[in-house]
Amino acid sequence: IREKLILPHVALKSEYYDLSLLNRNDTDDQVTVDAANATKKYGVAVKCATITPNKQRMEEYPQLKKLWPSPNGTIRSILDGTVFRTPILIDAVHPAVRNWKKPITVARHAYGDVYKAVDLHTDEPGECTMTFRGESGRETTLSIQKVDGPAVFQGQHNKEKSIRSFARACFQYALDIKQDLWFSTKDTISKIYDGTFRSIFDEEFEDYRARFDALGLTYFYTLIDDAVARVIRSQGGFIWACKNYDGDVMSDMISTAFGSLAMMTSVLVSPDGCWEYEAAHGTVTKHYYRYLRGEQTSTNPLATIFAWSGALRKRGELDALPELTAFADRLEQASLDTLSAGTMTGDLSALVEPGFSARTVSSAEFLDAVAARL
């Protein structure tokens, strides 16, 4: 994408950080921290999909020193902020949910919860407790569970400051794009943890209520299971704010139901004004292995193209470079026009409406077709 679509038109002034699994291994993951700090320094970043290793990957990469954490988790922890994910719609592909007419943006809290959790596996009977030791010296201990055999435990956290930043980002984003905001947790079960999220959202909304009313916008809270039912019955056209894990899962569901996971934009917005753009999907491992075998792949690059266009547009806005923002617009329009003309990758050609003439091309051929329209 960079070589075919960006460099022929833009004199990039960028720093590059190699977040490949082996380089993260070689640097003891310091490169990920450096990349996050560089994003804080420069304000705008583009991130490619990365590998988070599991036990299977340890067998594939025996040189790995450990199961390195998710680079996304590390970066989001450093930047804090909120991830906004919005599907890219085209006329030739209708959503699997027939009544969806407008995009649904998932606002995902980008800090804490299971992504900063600690896990414990035990092999004997006993009791697991959780202790908070304040700087004052005061301690609070809770019993998690007594077990009569092997068990697993997990401890997770979040910070009120981060939750407030999340709430404010969601309310401001709703005002910016003039859409209703929904927020969902499970505070009937998680009365303190999820209940704190709900209380903070309710408190912060009071500072935005008048502006919401002036625009005729609505904010409402509902339980996560009720929210899922409401989303499916809706026509779309709103922002759905979710905790970290809920947003991870639901954004994949939303993007796939709208057409393809490769048709969803993703931007992390931090409280201090940093913007990190990426594709919402992962590394598409099976396609990569086929590519290594010399086979042609038809992998949809649109979300990564839009990550580049989003970052270039934001850079242009911040630096008052209208030519750069105009190029970002042209890049997106060239990509959409290519799809409208029937040139598309296999994930989309299998979903087009009856009567639409689609030609399935490889990833490289699709990029060439977009480049020809720039």
Summary of predicted features, one role per range:
Residues 16, 21, 193-240, 244, ...:
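Active-site rim loops that border cofactor/substrate pockets in soluble metabolic enzymes
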Residues 9-16, 177-185, 209-221, 316-328, ...:
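Flexible, glycine/charged-enriched surface loops at secondary-structure junctions
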Residues 9-33:
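N-terminal beta-loop-helix "entrance" segment that forms/cooperates
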Residues 110-112, 116-167, 174, 321, ...:
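Glycine-rich phosphate/pyrophosphate-binding loop and the adjoining helix
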Residues 21-24, 231-341:
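Glycine-rich phosphate/nucleotide-binding loop
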Residues 1-7, 130-222:
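Glycine-rich phosphate/diphosphate-binding loop of Rossmann-like nucleotide-binding domains
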Residues 24-139, 245, 249:
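N-terminal glycine-rich phosphate/adenylate-binding segment common to multiple enzyme folds
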